[in-house]
Design a protein with these regions (language model features):
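C-terminal domain-boundary segment and adjacent tail
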Residues: 40-48, 76-78, 89-91, 222-273
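Hydrophobic alpha-helical membrane-insertion segments, chiefly the h-region
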Residues: 19-28
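N-terminal Sec-pathway targeting helices
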Residues: 1-18
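Active-site beta->alpha N-cap acidic-glycine motif
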Residues: 33-126, 131-147, 236
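Catalytic domains of cell-wall/extracellular-matrix polysaccharide-remodeling enzymes
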Residues: 114-216, 220-238, 242-243, 249, ...
Length: 273
């Protein structure tokens, strides 16, 4: 009698476990199809809640003119940043990308061409651009199993440009092992003929009242002396008590288990340094 009751209890417990596991898996799978589920911004803010933390990010490079000057400033202040690179620019300047990597900076994917009408035309074209950029990065770094895991949408995910198409693309990111991140403060350094002072004032305005800063800058052209505004920005934030961190630091603690899962799913090796 005791054996029968015990056996029934085990069966019931097993059924409960299966139901809970199946329900949790369904909820997780459903959430993974939502754009917000792969938005790293919320998680960065949550991790550093109550701290004054700044993340420097640079889009559209690498370039032979601006990137080395940006790297010189970062090295002088001992700051690691994130560079969201274009595959086309990587193909043109592989040596500069290698210098970024050797300097300890984190490399993110920004697509291949920065042509929104092509990048966001359909899900397959979107994935193809990201994977093409990854291959360019692998070739430049000579690391065959290098995998990016962080993407930044050209023009930003939250901008109204191609909004519905970007929603579709964002839902596809988890299937190729990616999350994305936008920004919450800018210098507008890519706007032509904007003075250094004006650019710095824009940064102060857009960063006001924020503890966690994801700062957007560019290392693609030499329009507005990005490296000068960068130095102004760094000094200003240091005086305000901010600590500079790299998104790779977040990647280390948050994505390690995702990398293992993704690697198993792909049946191959996933690289991270």
């Amino acid at each position: 009698m005791f054996f029968v009751i015990k056996q029934k209890s085990i069966i019931i417990i097993g059924l409960i476990f299966i139901i809970v596991f199946t329900t949790s898996f369904f909820i997780f799978s459903f959430a993974a199809n939502e754009p917000e589920s792969c938005d790293l911004m919320h998680e960065v803010k949550e991790k550093y809640r109550g701290e004054k933390v700044a993340f420097l990010t640079f889009d559209d490079g690498p370039s032979k003119i601006v990137t080395p000057k940006v790297l010189e400033v970062l090295e002088r202040y001992d700051i690691e940043a994130t560079f969201f690179v274009l595959g086309k620019a990587v193909d043109e300047n592989p040596d500069v990308l290698k210098t970024i990597y050797d300097g300890g900076h984190f490399i993110g994917n920004h697509g291949y061409s920065h042509k929104a009408n092509k990048l966001y035309s359909c899900e397959s074209a979107f994935k193809e651009e990201l994977q093409k950029t990854e291959e360019s990065i692998r070739q430049a770094l000579q690391i065959p199993d290098f995998n990016c895991t962080l993407f930044r949408f050209p023009n930003g995910f939250t901008s109204p440009i191609y909004k519905s198409q970007k929603n579709i693309c964002a839902k596809a990111l988890p299937s190729i092992g990616y999350k994305y991140i936008d920004w919450n403060s800018v210098t507008n350094d890519s706007v032509q003929k904007l003075s250094r002072e004006s650019s710095f004032n824009i940064f102060k305005k857009t960063s006001k009242g924020k503890d966690v800063l994801i700062i957007l800058m560019h290392d693609s052209g030499d329009l507005n002396k990005t490296y000068d505004v960068l130095e102004d920005t760094i000094n200003y934030l240091l005086e305000k008590g901010y600590e500079f961190k790299s998104l790779e630091e977040f990647f280390d603690w948050h994505f390690s288990y995702l990398l293992v899962l993704y690697s198993c799913k792909q049946g191959g090796k996933t690289w991270k340094r």
